[in-house]
């Protein structure tokens, strides 16, 4: 089993409801370690840059508005198969389809306000981590 790093974000719908600790505990309970974390309020420009891959999608404008509407918590997680573990504990994008006990089943309000984001591949993880963290901010 490979030790990996992945990117995780707790979105504004969850931070508004003071769920940062509960969600982080769910992540840590899978064996993942938080090796970097900070609370940020994304500017519109930061949200557009972070979600640039979705620029041509019909939901892009709504996504940017939502992500810049309140604080988020950005984190780097580390552990065995961290990307897969993080995605499993997050649950399906649509909370209606998420398995019981996953973050989205427990905490998400809707498909748009689904509480968390996580990298889907090693390449994406590397890019997303570098977007928010310098090497000196990641302390394993």
Curated annotation (Swiss-Prot):
It comes from the Bacteria. Its cofactor is Mg(2+). The active site is at residue 117. It catalyses: a 2'-deoxyribonucleoside 5'-diphosphate + ATP = a 2'-deoxyribonucleoside 5'-triphosphate + ADP; a ribonucleoside 5'-diphosphate + ATP = a ribonucleoside 5'-triphosphate + ADP. Keywords: ATP-binding, Cytoplasm, Kinase, Magnesium, Metal-binding, Nucleotide metabolism, Nucleotide-binding, Phosphoprotein, Transferase. ATP binds at residues 11, 59, 87, 93, 104, 114. Its EC number is 2.7.4.6. One of its GO terms (biological process) is GTP biosynthetic process. One of its GO terms (molecular function) is nucleoside diphosphate kinase activity. GO terms for cellular component: cytoplasm. Transmembrane segments: none annotated. It is found in: Cytoplasm. It is an enzyme of class 2 (transferase). Homotetramer. HAMAP family: NDP_kinase. Major role in the synthesis of nucleoside triphosphates other than ATP. The ATP gamma phosphate is transferred to the NDP beta phosphate via a ping-pong mechanism, using a phosphorylated active-site intermediate. PANTHER family: NUCLEOSIDE DIPHOSPHATE KINASE. Belongs to the NDK family. This is Nucleoside diphosphate kinase. The lineage of its organism: Bacteria, Pseudomonadati, Pseudomonadota, Alphaproteobacteria, Hyphomicrobiales.
């Amino acid at each position: 089993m490979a030790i990996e790093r992945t990117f995780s974000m707790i979105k504004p719908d969850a931070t508004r409801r003071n769920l940062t600790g509960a969600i982080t505990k769910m992540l840590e309970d899978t064996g993942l370690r938080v090796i970097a974390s900070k609370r940020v309020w994304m500017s519109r420009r930061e949200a557009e840059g972070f979600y640039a891959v979705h620029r041509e999608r019909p939901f892009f404008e709504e996504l940017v508005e939502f992500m810049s509407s309140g604080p988020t918590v950005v984190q780097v997680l580390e552990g065995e198969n961290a990307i897969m573990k993080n995605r499993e504990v997050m649950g399906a994008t649509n909370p209606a389809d998420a398995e019981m006990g996953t973050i989205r089943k427990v905490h998400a309000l809707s498909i748009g306000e689904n509480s968390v984001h996580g990298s889907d591949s090693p390449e994406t993880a590397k890019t997303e981590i570098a977007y928010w963290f310098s090497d000196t901010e990641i302390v394993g």
